[in-house]
Swiss-Prot record:
<feature type="binding site">
    <location>
        <position position="8"/>
    </location>
    <ligand>
        <name>Mg(2+)</name>
    </ligand>
</feature>
<dbReference type="GO" id="GO:0008967">
    <property type="term" value="F:phosphoglycolate phosphatase activity"/>
</dbReference>
<feature type="binding site">
    <location>
        <position position="10"/>
    </location>
    <ligand>
        <name>Mg(2+)</name>
    </ligand>
</feature>
<comment type="function">
    <text>Catalyzes the dephosphorylation of 2-phosphoglycolate.</text>
</comment>
<dbReference type="Pfam" id="PF08282">
    <property type="entry name" value="Hydrolase_3"/>
</dbReference>
<feature type="binding site">
    <location>
        <position position="152"/>
    </location>
    <ligand>
        <name>substrate</name>
    </ligand>
</feature>
<feature type="active site" description="Nucleophile">
    <location>
        <position position="8"/>
    </location>
</feature>
<keyword id="KW-0460">Magnesium</keyword>
<keyword id="KW-0119">Carbohydrate metabolism</keyword>
<dbReference type="InterPro" id="IPR006379">
    <property type="entry name" value="HAD-SF_hydro_IIB"/>
</dbReference>
<dbReference type="InterPro" id="IPR006382">
    <property type="entry name" value="PGPase"/>
</dbReference>
<dbReference type="GO" id="GO:0005829">
    <property type="term" value="C:cytosol"/>
</dbReference>
<dbReference type="GO" id="GO:0000287">
    <property type="term" value="F:magnesium ion binding"/>
</dbReference>
<protein>
    <recommendedName>
        <fullName>Phosphoglycolate phosphatase</fullName>
        <ecNumber>3.1.3.18</ecNumber>
    </recommendedName>
</protein>
<dbReference type="InterPro" id="IPR036412">
    <property type="entry name" value="HAD-like_sf"/>
</dbReference>
<dbReference type="InterPro" id="IPR023214">
    <property type="entry name" value="HAD_sf"/>
</dbReference>
<keyword id="KW-0479">Metal-binding</keyword>
Length: 226
């Protein structure tokens, strides 16, 4: 079965050392339908990946907070960037740190949410986020502070509308808590074997292989309809 594909980056297209497995490049390019890169990373990362793959710029960034579909030619923003900024300001004012050093390259281009290093205290971050009506999601790579009503499924709904398809037509592949809603909304959701409990619980199937090997396995299983 070939259908539109939505795929996460970290933990799904990568190896355990967090580098992208180059085998996924040709696999994505060969997929004979729409491919959407759906990530918690800020907008330049999925856009850059699409550019270097030579594929249409169909991206869900910042956990659904920023969406771009090339045929539509516009960026759609979901979420509350002012809320994320307020959480950052209050967290730092309380004596905590975002954890990315003097030059914060992680949040530099982030427009609708905030990412905090997982070595930083979580409890005060959650408390401050709650005060501002924001959620904190642990992706296994960072704590993401985002609008409570926005996630990758929100992004997929936007993408599907712009592409003229329905969300249930998609195959989705991911590994983390922030992929759970995406995996549930898609017609078929695969969690790779290294996925956390949230992603596993939301998926229709879990691959035997982990990381990029699991992604490649999921593509094979989707083609074979198994």
């Amino acid at each position: 079965m070939v259908a539109p594909l939505a795929v996460d980056i970290d933990g799904t297209l990568t190896r355990p050392d967090k580098s992208i497995d180059p085998r996924v490049f040709d696999a994505i390019r060969a997929w004979d339908d729409h491919v959407v890169i759906a990530t918690g990373k800020s907008f330049p990362y999925p856009v850059g990946l699409c550019e270097f793959l030579g594929m249409p710029l169909n991206v869900i960034a910042e956990n659904g907070g920023a969406v771009y579909v090339e045929p539509a030619g516009e960026v759609v923003y979901n979420g509350d960037p002012e809320g994320a900024a307020a959480v950052a300001e209050e967290y730092v004012a309380a004596g905590y740190d975002l954890g990315w050093g003097a030059v914060d390259m992680v949040n530099r281009w982030r427009e609708t949410e905030l990412a905090v290093d997982r070595d930083q205290p979580l409890e005060p971050l959650v408390a401050i986020a709650d005060d501002h009506g924001m959620d904190v999601v642990d992706t296994g790579y960072a704590y993401h502070v985002k609008d409570a009503g926005v996630d990758k499924a929100t992004g997929l709904e936007t993408v599907a509308e712009l592409l003229g398809v329905v969300p249930s037509s998609f195959i989705a592949i991911g590994d983390s808590e922030n992929d759970a809603e995406l995996l549930e909304l898609a017609g078929t959701g695969f969690a790779v074997a290294n996925a956390d409990a949230h992603a596993r619980g939301a998926a229709d199937a879990v691959t035997d292989a982990s990381f990029a090997d699991g992604f490649l396995e999921a593509l094979d299983r989707a083609r074979d309809n198994r």
